[in-house]
Amino acid sequence: EKADEKASQGIIGGLFGMRFPFISEGAMPCNNCLSNDALFKVQSDVIRHLAAERSCVFVGRCADYILREHPRCANVFISASKEDRIARLCGMHHIDAEAAEEMIEKADKRRSEYYNYYSFKTWGAAATYHLCIDSSSLGIDGTVRFIEEFVAKKLQL
C-alpha cells in the first residue's frame, strides 16, 4: 500500500472543505473518492495553514517533512521499549500480550510505509528529527517535561 489512509470525499469534504476553504484546487479529484495522494495533499494544506496561524502539535502525518521549511518547528520522535508498548496497549485495550504485539507490528509497518513513501525519508531515523527520545527511560510524564524543555530552548520561548 502506498499510504495508510483511505476516506471518502464526503467525510473529507465535511471535515476539511467546509472549515478549511484554503485547501488548494485539485485536492478533491472525484465526486465519490479521495486518493491517498489527494488525501496527503489535503492534510498537508491543513497542517501548513494551521502552523502559519498558531502554535500547534502535530502527531504523525509527515508533519515534520511538510513543515521542513517552517522556522519555528521542533521535530520529535518518541519511542519506547517493546515491553512498555505491549504493557500500555494491554492496559488500554484489555487485550493479551500477543494481540498487543500484533497491533504494534501492524501499526509500525503502516507508519513506516506511509512516512517513507510521502517524505522520502526513513521513519524513526535519528537524522530526520531534532530530538529522539525513549519514553521508557523517563516515563511518560518525564518525557513530556523533557520535550517541553527542549522545545522551549530550541524555539527560544
Q: Where are these predicted regions, by residue range?
A:
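Short gly/ser/thr-rich secondary-structure transition/capping motifs
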Residues: 37-41, 56-60, 113-117
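ATP-dependent small-molecule kinase phosphotransfer cores
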Residues: 1-55
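Conserved phosphate-donor/acceptor-positioning beta-strand/loop module used by diverse small-molecule
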Residues: 69-93, 97-105
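Conserved nucleotide-binding/hydrolysis micro-motifs of P-loop NTPases
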Residues: 63-64, 79-85, 138-139
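RNA pseudouridine synthases
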Residues: 50, 63-69
